[in-house]
């Protein structure tokens, strides 16, 4: 039964079962209540009567009242009283009576007076006739009455809580166990002590001019708030400056006034009280007098001895009562020697260490000891602190400290300040909410040891060295002083900087955060530090190191992070800041601020940097190409914060394992020319390691410093780079590497064989004219034995490549150009190399390289185009555009021939001659180069395709696929061929009239070979997706990256290739890759059904389907050019697709520089091609000639916009051209016929905004399919100031969205090549910091290397990849992808917007021509890149591109302001932590 009872009670079995007695009581109660109800049911009483009878009942005490009941009843009444608003005299009296009773004080009421009294004092409250308050006086036994304004104020405002506190404070003074005559002296003694302390404080206040903080630290008694009414005197001795008041998060407590500090809830303070104790002699008169020191002239306090006149023996002591209990060290506490400390100093429980107490106190008892790691989540990184307990540091929790003389107060306050500093520093590592991450890889592990009370040591692994680093916090002088100890460096300046930070924030995590940032910066310097401002950029300070904005950090929003020191130890840039500081605000998830910095440079650069790092090359050598490369951000400048060595090692191993046959390296040695070039600055110290391979030596540096990016146009003579194979090992392999450095600025990154790093190429934008950047450096080694064999065959065959070297000047056509550029380009061709344009695009003009015929066995000849082309009457030089074969129309070849004046064709008229645009160095527009597999060398003008061998021209940004090489002959070649070649080849094939199966096969082969590498590079792979196999190619072999494969991507000419390019580019770490990406697809646009294969990156827009290959690229600036070149290279399939509307597609070269066949470009002129499919069979290219101005800048802009618009006849208004870097203005090219400007373009031109902006107006997928604009949108934030989206183009970038992975992350990579006009032109491009070139980065590039590479199989679903890379993107992409079926449906417009930036199109195993989405981002890049290339002198910031609604861009910057999990506003944190 009891069981059922329990159940019925509803609370379950645990419930209490009532006893018999309880039941009886209950029944009695109910009976009584029933009686009461019956009694009053007939004659109801008023409430007053009931109240009276109840009261009478209690008074009569019919039975002994349980005191507990009485207390409960009383407290209930008092609570009620508390909620009654006092509006009348009666209410006031009742409330005061209630308060007095609660405090045990007597309350008396007179007509106008109320008294609240105790034995020792009474409070007199005067009311006026109306019953309102007029005055309050406090009478102490031994003193005359004191009028108390505080008490008046709180009663008038109805603040009875404060009134209560004050009454308590007054009565607490007398809580002594003594007779009244002694007791009454207590207040006198307390006042005497307060007077003395106030005198000491006034002494400090006089000589002090400064803020509340310096006063608080310098004053021996802290900040003193005198007694107010019943509130005791308060000394504020510590307040961490970082804490933000709740009200205004933008105002740090460091800006508080003295009063605010004293009233702040964050401050640590102590009040002076009197407590009962054993007998002590306490002063009853002030004992401090100020005496002027004869020697110093300063006033010094002197303390009078206590004697019978000024003191009294009483059972009391003064105490400093702390507002928050504080863990202190027992040893130090005992050393104070205070009277009566024994009770305080002997902790009740077992002895415990200070660290344990600190952890418990700081976590509010949530964490009991130091056994586990303490996680601290900062904006983009997580730290895990392990406290190492020091058994010697026994501690105790102190809440009050006794003292008896004023002289002891300064000692106690000094002790408290020190303990507070120690406590605050260690407690900064403790969070109440411990979020643990499974992902320990991305967490910085630190060990914190309290060596003593004056020293805290934090140990962590140096992110870039295999060693431990130690940060010591010395607390000797009451201020933290930091020292950093490391194996390799004596960080004196860094230690000073950290000391300033530590004093500002008093937080270990923030100091470590800053330290890691500084190491990141330092690492940047080591890697790319040499890259002084970058040739294009100007004086050393200004050029962005990555070509980005001002390096010095001064102009950046986050300049605080830049190094303050004038020059870092390694002598690199003065500012020491990251060029990219602007990007700091990147999306919070992206790994760390540092990474963000990095991000600002071009992603490609970053990757390149990463890869360079991996190669074990001397970090500087990569950049050595020098500063000039600013553009080079690519080189490594990328502020890419290369990831830590972990990654580097991983990749190193990969390379070691997979590429046994890569034996050569390229060493690049800049030989400073006229001292002006920035390059000379950083590089001089670089040691070149000579290893087999190619050595690239710039003979004189370029002077165009002021030009900002525009080296080419500047009067300075461009430097040439000579590439000589150092070892005879496999010349063919290396030969491809020539780097035509158009401008001295060319930064060639040192390449490791495996890394054909074009990296610098994209960045080179900075170097003004398209420095060849590293572009040329594609690694030569082939990735497979097959290739070797093939090459051998080629070499042996009778028709080897000519050995003769044409210098530009000698070559017939070239004379004019060469002279114009004033640079000589020499081309050394190794026997195997296919006719490569010698291209050093010296000045703007330089771009035109000499071309030589390709060897007969070269794939070129076999390509379909080739066959017809050679006969085609139209191409006098035998060049054919990729389309050539099928079409009867003038094709690239004709364009080229037209360009002859501008271009130099080889005397033999070999087909490969490319019409390299000579215009701005970008000229590499080799677009024309017909069959040859040329890659456009770096932007430089090399147009001629290099042999298929493993040249990863991709890298060269020009890698434009322009050369259309059919892969047919060499399947592997595509892989090995530089990616660009391969891509071009495929493109060529496609254009040929359909892709020949062979080409597909080749692509596949390339893919395969590359795949192995891919795995290692998986991260790059994100890009890949590209349609079909193409995407994979990238990693292939020596970094040839399978660009070719990419191109191959689809029989249909699917744009997939583009993504492949990207991969490869990534692989190379080149910006170029990025470019290709861009191109690849953007325009690819589904609209054009199968035929299009666009590979070229820069001109992504050019993708128009029918358009045949207009590849001309006129890269303006190297950096930009690189990206652009790829784009220009795009090759469209010629076959008209029935479905596709013939659209005029304008391929403007991004550089605009490429010459088109039809016209002759004046030396500097850049041209754009307009392709109109006039008939189904062929396209007609119309070339607009631009003014002869040499400015390289012009071309680029247009290219982006010109993108092809499938539908719009007018083709996008074309890009605006920028005013040449020289400043001469170019005509605007709209891509329409010469006379015509299509509306938007023409308007845009005026803006001279970076190309990125030019296209901004269009939607990504316009009907026209013009991808050009995308770029602008992507480029996202406008120029310099904003944080450009670094990510912008690359969708994929895996910028660590996830947990912060510190060092390795390359988050920074994402940004574009930034190399662009280093500071000068801050194109909107992603590289924010750098010139727009960053845009060129392909998404893949941006992906951060640190992520484990996802593995890609052909079949990997695109969305999966996207998910990996960026969930946001994936979401926006999904609809878009659905729209693209193998059937090439044109996605509805509504769907199109979203796809904008996805990196890769699905990869479909079949070669079907699915357009590769990847392209999209690329297109963006293209324009951007081009713009970067041109750094125009005027460098107007581009107009920020309009952001179309669902562009899918990753706008990292958007999250910048969000508060971190710690609740610290990130901006504020940055400003406080930074200098």
From Swiss-Prot:
Keywords: Activator, Nucleus, Phosphoprotein, Transcription, Transcription regulation. Residues 621-641, 711-729, 738-782, 919-934, 954-966, 973-989, 1143-1159, 1185-1225, 1265-1276, 1334-1346, 1399-1409 have a biased composition (Low complexity). PANTHER family: MEDIATOR OF RNA POLYMERASE II TRANSCRIPTION SUBUNIT 1. Residues 1-10, 860-874, 888-897, 1286-1296, 1415-1430, 1442-1458 have a biased composition (Polar residues). Its main location: nucleus. Residues 944-953 have a biased composition (Pro residues). The modification Phosphoserine is found at residues 830, 834, 854, 858. GO terms for biological process: positive regulation of transcription by RNA polymerase II; regulation of transcription by RNA polymerase II. Component of the Mediator complex, a coactivator involved in the regulated transcription of nearly all RNA polymerase II-dependent genes. Mediator functions as a bridge to convey information from gene-specific regulatory proteins to the basal RNA polymerase II transcription machinery. Mediator is recruited to promoters by direct interactions with regulatory proteins and serves as a scaffold for the assembly of a functional preinitiation complex with RNA polymerase II and the general transcription factors. Required for activated transcription of the MtnA, MtnB and MtnD genes. One of its GO terms (molecular function) is transcription coregulator activity. It is found in: Nucleus. Residues 1-26, 616-644, 709-992, 1135-1166, 1184-1245, 1263-1354, 1387-1475 are annotated as: Disordered. This is Mediator of RNA polymerase II transcription subunit 1. The keyword Chaperone does not apply. It comes from Drosophila melanogaster. Belongs to the Mediator complex subunit 1 family. It holds the Pfam family Med1. Component of the Mediator complex. The gene is MED1. One of its GO terms (cellular component) is nucleus. It comes from the Eukaryota.
């Amino acid at each position: 039964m009891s069981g059922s009872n329990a159940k019925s009670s509803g609370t379950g079995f645990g419930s209490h079962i009532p006893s018999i007695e309880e039941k009886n009581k209950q029944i009695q109660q109910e009976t009584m209540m029933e009686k009461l109800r019956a009694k009053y049911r007939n004659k109801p009483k008023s409430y007053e009567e009931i109240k009276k009878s109840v009261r009478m009942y209690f008074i009569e005490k019919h039975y002994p009242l349980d005191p507990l009941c009485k207390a409960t009843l009383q407290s209930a009444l008092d609570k009620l009283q508390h909620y009654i608003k006092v509006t009348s005299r009666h209410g006031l009296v009742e409330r005061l009576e209630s308060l007095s009773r609660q405090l045990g004080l007597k309350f008396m009421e007179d007509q106008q007076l109320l008294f609240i009294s105790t034995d020792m004092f009474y409070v007199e409250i005067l009311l006026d006739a109306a019953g309102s308050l007029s005055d309050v006086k406090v009478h102490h036994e031994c003193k005359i009455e004191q009028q108390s304004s505080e008490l008046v104020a709180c009663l008038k405002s109805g603040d009875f809580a404060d009134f209560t506190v004050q009454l308590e404070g007054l009565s607490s003074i007398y809580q002594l166990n003594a007779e009244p005559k002694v007791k009454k002296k207590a207040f006198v003694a307390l006042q005497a002590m307060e007077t003395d302390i106030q005198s000491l404080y006034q002494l400090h206040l006089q000589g002090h001019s400064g803020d509340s903080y310096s006063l608080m630290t310098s004053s021996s008694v802290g900040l003193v708030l005198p007694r107010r009414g019943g509130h005791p005197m308060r000394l504020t001795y510590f307040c961490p400056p970082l804490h933000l008041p709740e009200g205004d998060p933008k105002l740090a407590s460091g800006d508080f006034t003295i009063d605010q500090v004293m009233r702040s809830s964050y401050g640590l303070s102590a009040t002076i009280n009197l407590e009962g104790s054993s007998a002590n002699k306490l002063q009853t008169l002030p004992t401090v007098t100020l005496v002027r020191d004869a020697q110093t002239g300063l006033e010094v306090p002197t303390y009078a001895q206590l004697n019978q006149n000024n003191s009294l023996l009483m059972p009391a002591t003064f105490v400093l009562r702390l507002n928050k209990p504080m863990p202190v060290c027992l040893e130090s506490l005992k050393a104070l020697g205070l009277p009566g400390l024994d009770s305080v100093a002997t902790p009740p429980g077992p002895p415990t260490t200070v660290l344990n107490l600190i952890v418990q106190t700081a976590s509010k008892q949530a964490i009991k000891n130091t056994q586990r790691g303490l996680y601290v989540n900062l904006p983009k990184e997580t730290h895990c602190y392990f406290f190492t307990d020091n058994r010697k540091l026994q501690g105790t929790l102190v809440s009050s400290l006794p003292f008896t003389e004023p002289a002891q107060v300064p000692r106690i306050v000094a002790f408290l300040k020190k303990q507070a500093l120690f406590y605050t520093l260690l407690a900064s590592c403790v969070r109440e909410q411990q979020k643990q991450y499974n992902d320990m890889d991305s967490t910085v592990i630190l060990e914190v040891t309290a060596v003593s009370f004056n020293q805290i040591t934090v140990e962590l692994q140096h992110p870039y060295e295999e060693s431990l680093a130690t940060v010591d916090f010395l607390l000797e002088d009451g201020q933290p002083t930091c020292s950093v100890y490391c194996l390799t460096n004596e960080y004196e300046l860094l230690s000073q900087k950290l000391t300033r930070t530590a004093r500002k924030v008093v937080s270990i995590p923030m100091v470590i955060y800053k330290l890691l940032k500084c190491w990141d910066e330092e690492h940047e310097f080591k890697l790319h530090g040499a890259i002084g401002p970058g040739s294009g950029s100007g004086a050393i300070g200004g050029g962005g190191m990555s070509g980005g904005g001002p390096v010095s950090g001064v102009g950046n929003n986050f300049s605080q992070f830049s190094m303050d020191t004038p020059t870092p130890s390694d002598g690199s840039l003065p500012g020491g800041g990251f060029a990219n500081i602007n990007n700091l605000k990147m999306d919070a998830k992206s790994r760390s601020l540092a990474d963000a910095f990095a991000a600002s440079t071009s992603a490609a650069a970053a990757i390149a940097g990463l890869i360079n790092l991996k190669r074990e090359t001397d970090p500087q050598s990569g950049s050595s190409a020098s500063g000039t490369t600013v553009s080079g951000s690519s080189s490594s400048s990328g502020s890419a914060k290369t990831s830590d060595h972990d990654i580097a090692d991983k990749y190193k191993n990969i390379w070691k394992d997979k590429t046994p046959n890569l034996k050569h390296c390229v060493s690049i040695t800049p030989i400073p020319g006229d001292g002006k070039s920035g390059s000379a600055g950083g590089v001089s110290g670089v040691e070149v390691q000579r290893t087999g391979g190619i050595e690239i030596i710039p003979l004189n540096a370029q002077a165009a410093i002021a030009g900002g990016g525009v080296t080419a146009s500047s009067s300075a003579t461009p430097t040439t780079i000579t590439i000589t194979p150092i070892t005879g090992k496999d010349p063919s392999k290396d030969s491809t590497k020539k780097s035509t450095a158009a401008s001295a600025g060319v930064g060639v990154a040192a390449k490791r064989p495996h890394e054909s790093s074009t990296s610098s190429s994209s960045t080179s934008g900075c170097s003004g004219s398209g420095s060849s950047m590293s572009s040329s450096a594609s690694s030569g080694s082939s990735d497979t034995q097959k290739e070797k064999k093939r090459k051998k065959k080629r070499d042996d065959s009778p028709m080897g490549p000519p050995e003769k070297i044409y210098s530009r000047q000698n070559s017939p056509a070239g004379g004019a150009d060469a002279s114009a550029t004033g640079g000589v380009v020499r081309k050394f061709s190794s026997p195997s190399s296919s006719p490569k344009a010698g291209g050093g695009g010296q000045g703007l003009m330089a771009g035109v390289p000499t071309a030589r015929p390709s060897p007969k066995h070269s794939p070129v000849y076999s390509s379909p185009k080739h066959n017809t082309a050679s006969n085609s009457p139209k191409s006098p030089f035998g060049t054919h555009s990729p389309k050539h074969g099928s079409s009867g129309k003038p094709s690239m070849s004709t364009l080229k021939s037209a360009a002859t004046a501008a271009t130099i064709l080889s005397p033999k008229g070999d087909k490969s001659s490319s019409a390299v645009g000579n215009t701005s160095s970008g000229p590499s527009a080799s677009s024309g180069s017909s069959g040859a597999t040329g890659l456009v060398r770096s932007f430089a003008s090399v147009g001629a395709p290099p042999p298929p061998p493993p040249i990863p021209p991709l890298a060269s940004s020009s890698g434009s696929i322009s050369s259309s090489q059919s892969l047919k002959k060499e399947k592997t070649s595509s892989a090995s061929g530089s990616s660009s070649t391969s891509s071009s080849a495929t493109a060529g094939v496609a254009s040929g009239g359909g892709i020949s199966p062979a080409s597909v096969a080749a692509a596949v082969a390339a893919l395969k070979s590359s795949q192995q590498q891919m795995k290692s590079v998986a991260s790059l792979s994100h890009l890949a997706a590209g349609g079909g196999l193409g995407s994979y190619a990238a990693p292939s072999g020596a970094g040839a990256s399978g660009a070719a494969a990419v191109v191959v991507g689809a029989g249909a000419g699917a744009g997939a290739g583009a993504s492949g390019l990207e991969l490869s580019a990534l692989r190379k770490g080149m910006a170029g890759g990025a470019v290709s990406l861009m191109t690849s697809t953007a325009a690819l646009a589904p609209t054009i059904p199968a035929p299009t294969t666009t590979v070229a990156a820069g001109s992504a827009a050019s993708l128009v389907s029918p358009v045949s290959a207009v590849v001309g690229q006129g890269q303006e600036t190297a950096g930009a050019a690189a990206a652009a070149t790829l784009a220009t290279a795009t090759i469209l399939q010629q076959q008209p697709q029935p479905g596709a509307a013939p659209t005029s597609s304008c391929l403007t070269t991004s550089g605009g520089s490429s010459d088109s066949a039809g016209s002759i470009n004046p030396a500097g002129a850049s041209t754009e091609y307009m392709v109109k499919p006039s008939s189904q069979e062929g396209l007609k290219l119309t070339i607009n000639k631009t003014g002869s101005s040499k400015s390289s800048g012009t071309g680029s802009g247009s290219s982006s916009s010109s993108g092809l618009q499938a539908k719009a006849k007018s083709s996008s208004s074309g890009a605006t051209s920028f005013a040449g870097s020289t400043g001469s203005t170019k005509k605007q090219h709209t891509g329409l016929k010469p006379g015509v400007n299509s509306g938007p373009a023409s308007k845009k031109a005026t803006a001279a905004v970076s190309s990125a902006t030019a296209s901004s107006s269009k939607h990504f997928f316009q009907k026209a399919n013009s991808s050009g604009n995308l770029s602008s949108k992507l480029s996202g934030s406008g120029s310099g100031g904003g944080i450009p989206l670094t990510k912008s183009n690359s969708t994929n970038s895996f910028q660590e969205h996830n947990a912060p992975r510190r060092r390795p992350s390359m988050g920074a990579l994402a940004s574009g090549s930034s190399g662009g006009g280093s500071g000068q032109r801050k194109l909107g491009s992603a590289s924010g910091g750098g010139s727009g070139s960053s845009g060129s980065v392909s998404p893949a590039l941006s992906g951060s290397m640190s992520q484990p590479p996802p593995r890609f199989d052909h079949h990997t679903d695109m969305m999966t990849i996207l998910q990996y890379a960026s969930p946001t993107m994936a979401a926006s992409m999904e609809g878009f992808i659905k729209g693209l079926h193998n059937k090439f449906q044109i996605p509805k417009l509504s769907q199109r917007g979203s796809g904008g930036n996805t990196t890769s199109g699905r990869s479909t195993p079949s070669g079907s021509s699915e357009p590769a989405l990847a392209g999209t981002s690329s297109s963006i890049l293209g324009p951007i890149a081009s713009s970067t290339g041109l750094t125009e002198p005027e460098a107007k910031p581009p107009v920020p591109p309009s952001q179309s609604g669902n562009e899918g861009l990753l706008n990292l910057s958007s999250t910048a302001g969000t508060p971190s999990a710690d609740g610290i506003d990130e901006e504020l944190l940055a400003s406080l932590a930074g200098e």
